[in-house]
Structures are given as structure tokens and as C-alpha cells.
Amino acid sequence: MGRRKSKRKPPPKRKNIEPLDQQFNCPFCNHEKSCEVKMDKSRNTAKITCRVCLEDFQTGINFLSEPIDVYNDWVDACETAN
């Protein structure tokens, strides 16, 4: 006599982790991927600059900060200024 067939579910598939962007769209000139973030974790500062319109923004960071956080701070500062 044979065993009954197992009805156990297969293990869930792992999702691929996609890396976060390092270059962003400029909120001033609207060029795609023209803004680049430079982070200096030893000084706890980050600077984002646009290569096309030469706009820049500098902000303070902590050890958990990522380039997307600097970009979001820049966009938030633009919205509060307007």
C-alpha cells in the first residue's frame, strides 16, 4: 500500500531586493537622473547637485540616511519655500 500524497504548500518565493536609486530627477529643471548625491558620513552632511542647472542643496544626515532621504529633504525644502 502506498502513502497518501502530501498536501503541504511549497515554501514562499523570496522577492528580489532592488537597490535604491543614486541619481534623481531635478525638481527645478525636470531633467531625468541629473541630480547626484554626495554623502560625507564623517561630517554628517550630504550635498545634492544638479549637473544641468547647477542647483544644489546641503543637509545634515545620520548613520541611517540614504541618498533618497537627502533627495526627499530637498523636495520638502522646495515645497516649504514656495
Curated annotation (Swiss-Prot):
GO terms for cellular component: transcription elongation factor complex. One of its GO terms (biological process) is transcription elongation by RNA polymerase II. Coiled coil: none annotated. GO terms for molecular function: RNA polymerase II complex binding; zinc ion binding. It comes from the Eukaryota. It is found in: Nucleus. Keywords: Metal-binding, Nucleus, Transcription, Transcription regulation, Zinc, Zinc-finger. Zn(2+) binds at C26, C29, C50, C53. InterPro entries: Elf1 (IPR007808), T_Elf1_sf (IPR038567). It holds the Pfam family Zn_ribbon_Elf1. Transcription elongation factor implicated in the maintenance of proper chromatin structure in actively transcribed regions. Belongs to the ELOF1 family. PANTHER family: TRANSCRIPTION ELONGATION FACTOR 1 HOMOLOG (PTHR20934:SF0). This is Transcription elongation factor 1 homolog. The lineage of its organism: Eukaryota, Metazoa, Ecdysozoa, Arthropoda, Hexapoda.
